[in-house]
């Protein structure tokens, strides 16, 4: 029994390590933008993201957010970018949401809202808007 258990542990351990090395991992979210520098400024101003790497039209930011300019996206995918498509959203939590909205309106008065600041029936305050390139963003208070 001891030999069987040791063999099983060895096989299990080997397979687990192999699985860890070969299976993919989620690494982040890429959003398409017209101008990476303009988008970087927006995400830095509003959310505190910092630039990690700049590859001329492709940027890696902190918190695993990636920016790619629309020209590259359309060249690689052979598909058009569809701003304001409402297919997904970037979600953030902010305990001082009123302050956040005030900063957003001061720095980016042209921002397009989907929902102005509102309170859900469960008590969470949220605001939804598009970034400068039509990517949907939701900011809510922690639940």
Region roles according to the model:
Residues 1-23:
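Short, Lys/Arg-enriched N-terminal segments with co-localized hydrophobic residues
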Residues 16-38, 88-90:
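N-terminal beta-strand motif that seeds the catalytic metal site of vicinal oxygen chelate
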Residues 45-52, 108-111:
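Conserved acetyl-CoA-binding loop of GNAT-fold acetyltransferases
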